Every structure is written in C-alpha cells, then in structure tokens.
Amino acid sequence: MRIQALSLFLVFCLCGVQAQVKTSQIPTWVTPTEYSQSPAIDKNELSQGTLQLLRDNQTHLVKETVYIRQVTQVIDNAAIQEAGTINVDYDPTFQELVFHEINILRNSSSIDKLQPNNFQLLRREANAENYLYDGSMTAMVNLSDVRPGDIIDYSYSIKGFNPIHKGLFSNSYTFDGYSPVGKINVRLLSNKPLKYKGFNGLEKPFLNKINGLNEYTWTSTDVTPLTYEEYDPAWNINYKLLLVSAYDSWASVVNWAVNVYQENQPLSDDLSSHIEQIASATEDEGERIQKVLDFVQEDIRYLGLEEGIGGYQPFSPNQVYEQRFGDCKDKSLLMASMLKQLDIEAYPMLVNTTLKQSILDFLPSPIFFDHCVVKVIDNSGKVYYYDPTISSQGGSYAKTHFPDYRYGLVIKRGVREFDQISSRSENKVEVKDEYRLDSIGKGAILKVKSVYHDAKADQMRQYFKSQSLNAINKEYEKYYANYFYNIKSIEHPQLTDDVLANRLQVIEKYKIDSIWQPMEDKKNLIEVQFVPNSIDGLLFIPNVEHRKNPVSLDYPSHHIHDITVHLPAAWDIQSEIESVEHDSFDYQYRATYIPFVNQLKLHFEIKSKKDHITVEKFSDYSRKVNDLSNKLGYVIYTTSDGSSLTEFETGNGTLKIVGLIAVAALIIMILVVRSNQSARNDAYRRRGGFY
C-alpha cells in the first residue's frame, strides 16, 4: 500500500530514485512557436528573479497528447536555485512522460542539458497532510552550471488522458499571472468541433484546418501581471481565462456522472444489516436521516485515494463501509445508498466550493467541480443538503449547517440544470465580557462567556476536539495578551455543548494585573480600553474609496458582543446609541451607564446581509466602515491618583492601534478552527477531481 510509505508532514517522499526518463524528438504535429528574447514588458514588475519568455501548450486530442514548452530567462543570482530545477508531474496510471529538449541559451550558443540519467522520480503526495493520495509522480532534474542571463528552454509531452472522461476533452487555461510573460500560446487539434469561451477580453482563436483536423490557436504577447486586491472573492473571475469543452450541455455532464456513480452490485450483508439496525432503532424519517449522516460523517474517516480514475469515480458503498474511509464522493454515494435503502430519496450532488454563482458562466464539464455532497428529499417533498465530509456537526437533521456552495448539479438522470442552494444558518456568535475593576490604577477580573451557533459551533467543537485543554488555554492567554499586559488564566475554559441545538458555550476567566495603562501623550492620565475583539477584524477596512473588484464578506454571519464593566467608583458617562446601515451589513452600538451600581454596559452588533460588496457600492462601504472602525471600542480614563474621573472616549488613535493588533490575533484563531475544505480546493486546482 502506498499510504504506508507516506508521512503526513512531507510534501515529497524523500526516497527519490535515479531513473532514466523517456526522450524523443518533438512530435511532428507540433507547430514551432516563435518568441522574443526582449519582450515589451516592464521589468520592474518581475518577481523571483526570472522572466518567462514563452509558455506554450499544444494538445492533440486524437493522439491524447499534451506538448508543453517553457522558456525562462534568469535575471539574477537569486533565481538560479529555482530556475535551475525542472519538475514535471504526471499520473503513471494513465500517463507517460517524454522529454524532448532541455537547452541553455548563453551568448548566442545553445548548451544541451537533456541527460536522461540525471532525472529523479519522486512519489509526489502534495496533499498527504490533508489525507488525499493521488499517486502522482514527479520527474525532477537539477541543471548544472546555470548563470544569470541564461535562457532555459525545455519541452516535453505527456501522453494519455484520464479514461474516466471517455474521450470527452475539457480544460481551462489562464492568460494572466503574478509576473509578466512575453508570450502565451495555446493550440488545440481536434477531429470534432469544440466549445470554447473566453473571459475578460480574451481574443477569439485563430481557426484553421490541418490534415483534416480542426485547429484552434490563442496567442497573447507582452502579458502584463494581474493586479490583485485584498478580499477579492474566490468566485470573481477577473483574469483572462479560456474554457474548452466537448460536453454539449450540463445534462450530458449529469449523464456522465450517473454512469460513473452507478452502483453495480447489491449492498453487502454487513452494510444491509447496519441499515436494518438504523431502521429498527428509529421511528421517523428525520431520525433515520440523522443516524445515517452521523455514521458517514463520524465513523467513515476522511481519506481519498485519487489515483487515476479515482479522482472522479467513487468506491462502491460496500468497499467504503468495509474499509471505513473515503473522500467526498465515497462518503456521498454511501450516504445516498443507505438512505435509499431506508426509502428516503437521496442523490450525490456535484458542487464547486469556491466558484459559487460563477459556475453558471462556465462551459459544461465535470472538471469544473471540486466536491461532492448529498441532496435529500423527505416524504413531504422538503429538500435538505448535507456535506458528509464535515465532522463534529451539531443540530437536528432539519437544521444541520450546509456551507454556502450556492449551486449544485444533482447526479440524477433527467437533471438539466443546477439546484440553487440557500444557507439556513445564521452562524451567530454571542460574546459577553464582564470586567470587575479593582481600585483605580490596579488590576481586574475578566470573565468571558461565548456562545456559538450553527457553523461557528461546529468549528469550535472541532477545535476543542483536536487540541488539548492546556494548549487551548495557552492560546487563549496569548490571544488576550494582545489587549492586556500581564493577563493570566484563572481556570481552564469551561465547555458546554448542546449538540442537538448546535449551541456551544465557552466560559473563560482571567486575572489582569495591570489593566490601567498610561495614556499616550497625556501626562498623569491613565486609561482602560474595552474592545469587542470578536467583532474587531470582521469587516475589511480599506484605505481607498474605489477599487476594481468586489469585496468578500463572511456570510452568513451575526456577531453580538456585550461588555459589562463594574467600575470602582462613580463615573461621568453619558449614554449613547448609534447604528450604521449598509447594503451588505448592519451595525449597532449602544453605551449605557447605570449610576447606582457604577456599571457601564456596551453593546456591539454586526450582521452581514450579503457575501460581498459590489464595486458600485464600495465607495459608500469604504466611508461607512472607516467611520465604524473608529467606534469599535470604548475608553475610560482618569488621573493616575484617581482624583478626577473623566468622561469616556471612543475611537482614539491608541484604540485603533489595539484594534489592528487584534486583527492579526483574530486571524490566527480563525485559521486554527477552519475546516479542511480550502486544502481540498488547492488539490482541485492542481489536478481536478472531487474531494
């Protein structure tokens, strides 16, 4: 088993073997592509010390062969390490790699560097840490004597298409990048007409007939780098993109998928027995859906064998049940099969986890999906969607969180269009901070009660399962240290989990030795800052009023942060209320002082209404969110001896700096509890398939 040789922490298996790769002349069907060694590009845009002069991709569909040529100039010494190493990935189960040329052009001479014996073959498992094993091989060669100014020109072919597609070709090509490119060339030869679609001003192809084949050629020269903006939504296709497909409709993709997901054998005795146990132990349909979902999510561990056709074709439900592991398509087919056996209508469904509504603009093809989930229809006709790869989910069958994938293609014969999916989750987070201040200039006790709902509860539940309580306690302390000097946890976080309601509560308690700090630029004054850290950093705070791309927002999302401060003396504080309404979010702020108990109450609330801000609405958003960012906090201050208790301040410069520090800490926390889905997306972009 290849899994046994893998470490989950290695990108490459280190036991590379010396091997002789196959070599041949450049195929006769390939058209030589000319390029300029001095393209009209801005060299100040170059990164990593190299200039890509040519990116050439030619595909012969009848011969099932892809020819690749890369020409790169080394600009300075810093790039020699990377430019002098050539890596080519391929799947040995259905592909064959053949190198044609490796030349170094130096001072008008060409140096032949193609030495087949110098190659190493490495078993590449780039996603092993995410429990995905694709069986890819990497042919690697390190070139000797590479110098600044050299032009490295190499070409190779990969023979063989994935047989799962039954000869139906589809692919995508980008004509933009992080750095300038002298020339990009894409050429296709096909014996059948191809559908193609360009985005963002990509020019139409040059069409020709050659030896009875249809020839399609796209060429871009002096390609400028794409300008990237923060918080650009993943679904926003703002680059030059070419899609090519032989599929004539989404219905034909469904028909392909129905055959790939065909169950060709009856359920095994063991699996049938398990299903019968569920039927006997439950009384209604909802309970049965819940039992099957729990079993597939928790008892079938996430692990994918994606070698060859395995990137698209699921294992049989019997095998997945027996081996107790599978990826998204394995889990989805097993879940749908179990529900059907219980007389509940269910189907696997293909989604793209990042494209969302943009998938509607794509040409029909299965390669544009990266994930598989399940659609369930109960006896009353009500529709539910489930992601069987998510673990530690709470909620009843009717309220289980389903991610905002937006559109899905159900694998059911006769389906011709996408299901539109709306999230039922609010994903509310409620935080209550209670500060009990000692005498002025001294410390305080902080008690924090956080309540998480829906997907936020799922994430925190998984976070607490995957970390020790001691480690969590240290991370929490480190997080609050961004706000308060010398803060120590009094006790470990206390967790209360109502799984059925999907409501998870965490209580923390801290001692702050020095909550009062000197005010900047104000002698003899000390202050305490109160920041709603669960909200701070949720909204992108731009420093411009205009941009070219939409802004991505966390959606659906509802955050409430209440702060109660028990003051050591009476304070001169005025109550105030403020709200901000925008097309994409609502914000509320309220400050109340209760004089007879010397208590200050603060309320902060943000609710997202959309998953993005449009370019047209951005200017208004920028003004409002920048004004709002100066009000995400509260300050009380007095003289260092406490002789003069002064009114509050909001949004001063010092507080804003604290907020910026908090953003970094908040991002760390978000990364800790995030799901593995983004890792699956990376795998999709590299190879294709459903994970």
Stretches found by the model and what they are:
Residues 1-6:
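Bacterial N-terminal signal peptides that target proteins for export
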Residues 7-15:
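Bacterial N-terminal signal peptides
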Residues 8, 37-39, 679:
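Compositionally biased regions
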Residues 14-15, 47, 686-687:
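Intrinsically disordered, low-complexity segments enriched in small/polar residues
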Residues 20-670:
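A sensor for short, sequence-defined functional sites
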Residues 679-691:
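Cytoplasmic C-terminal tails of single-pass
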Residues 670-679:
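Cytosolic-side junction of a single-pass transmembrane alpha-helix
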